[in-house]
């Protein structure tokens, strides 16, 4: 938000230097930078004075102007009709950077010979300086302009550039900044209630206003001005609009923009003669309605948008932009001026839904008090009468369906000191409230003493100004006390107790640990948007149409739904990065997915998904060209889960998107927590992946419930272990997991590890050989061979009964 300092001083006269002023406001919570509106512009451009004006010897429409620019005199050839001896003008020397009056592009001024006469410079118009589109004549400066001064210094103005926080919509205008600065320097700004002289008929005879939804439009005020003359605004008004970053258009539109910058209330002018019905209705849009706005674009409307209409047609998008059908044009002689208060959520949805952000919508989105509407309307009417002429109808249209009484905020002065930490000489909260323009009264609240907030005489009721919509509770008011008194006045006190130890929540702690583990395994983390497209998710979904959580106002078609899986972003990233990575690539992502449910709620589990592709070794000397396989990713999962203090088991699975026979479900205890396997060629092809890719996916929201189980300490076994090897011939369809499950049921078997598998000529065609290394150990005594032999016999018998396995000879 840009505010000219001269304009600000009209409401709050002060001798404070701009840098100090900016420092005070910055330290009070609003960052301010001091700018010069024309600093570093117009090199070699000076204030000059016309000494002579002579006719051009070879051209009737050109004149020779001799200009004194403080360091000498130069002769300039110009066709400007308003050159007079003694006038102060803007003189540009050779090398100056100006705007070409014909095409609007920047040019570097060079020496020129015009009709046989050398021109050493230029006397400039407003357009050539970039101040406006005016180029019919040169810019004539006031008589007090100092000859020889740089034009950037003379025409420049100190501008305050405010970086506003979302809650301070009141600072989006000059009067709001004046109130803020006035509170900081303890001086009330001179802001009076405007009014205008009405000489026309009663406005109620000319127009009828109706509000159909008082929640979306809390107040609608309007005035009528007849006999206006549309034209260019005066220079002072145009200069202020330009300094604030706005483009002058015509005197009526400029007046509404000026008042918006002055008071913060957006206004809109309708061509009254185009409102044929003389009846305005404020209502929500109906499905399928359209409106051509002032920018000439036909816009499709939705029911959550608020409209200004006649009974049979739409004439404006409330709070955002007017309609082309009631636009003020050169033929306009009567205008209806609107100043209304619209619901901020409604305006935000409309502006974003139509991608139509404006200065007006930005102010409505922050929230405006309905008390501001008639004040700004009177000021705008007054200004238009001043610069565009005409007669104002008597009175105002003021539709206020539900007037709300302000209850004020009950504040304990003791609580102010308690919250801010003052012990001696605390700031006077009542005086600060007065400096802010608020009203305060003594308050009696029975029973507050028992809460430690002070006796009856300690309580006050504060009524914030209507412009401070962000002051709602006593804590808000306490913040104002700290801001205005100065944060530097709050005493620094030593801690009176130890800082409590806050334990890291289990899930964030697990995620941090997993990042460390995966980083050690050579993985790189991917962070993608939670928003994605239906098309992207459908690539990893089964044939049935999947359900998604749709976003009501997506930024683009590629971010229209919430993700239900991390796989698409990982596969797409893998495909994009494999072109630049010759060795193996390992990627993972930690994040939530959003799963819709029938009861219109949703699950948001925290997931870990990882992919690996390429060579399994990056060591150049090793020259290992073997690629990753199923057992690599299985080993990573086993090791990772083991480092969490858990044990992973694997079961046969049939997950869509993974190759049949090269996938497995992940169990921790008896709980399914994830899946791993090779990405199917069909799915890989959808992401333009041409090589084998392996992945694993784990539901951390489930895994954490197992990791949180407190584990008991087991002492180191002091009895020796006995090792045996067991080679079995077994049917090919029997899995290693089935054998391991049987072996693990025997207490003396502490570990069983598959170390060999064979299929070949020496074994029947439908059989295979599995060889296991078994570790036997007792917790209470040293095992004897007879005891181990007995357990081995039991194992062989059970394996034979349940799987048909026999001991390999």
From Swiss-Prot:
UniProt keyword annotation of Chloroplast present: no
Reactions catalysed, as given in the entry: tRNA(Phe) + L-phenylalanine + ATP = L-phenylalanyl-tRNA(Phe) + AMP + diphosphate + H(+)
Localisation: Cytoplasm
A GO term for molecular function: phenylalanine-tRNA ligase activity
Subunit structure: Tetramer of two alpha and two beta subunits.
Protein family: Belongs to the phenylalanyl-tRNA synthetase beta subunit family. Type 1 subfamily.
Protein name, UniProt field: Phenylalanine--tRNA ligase beta subunit
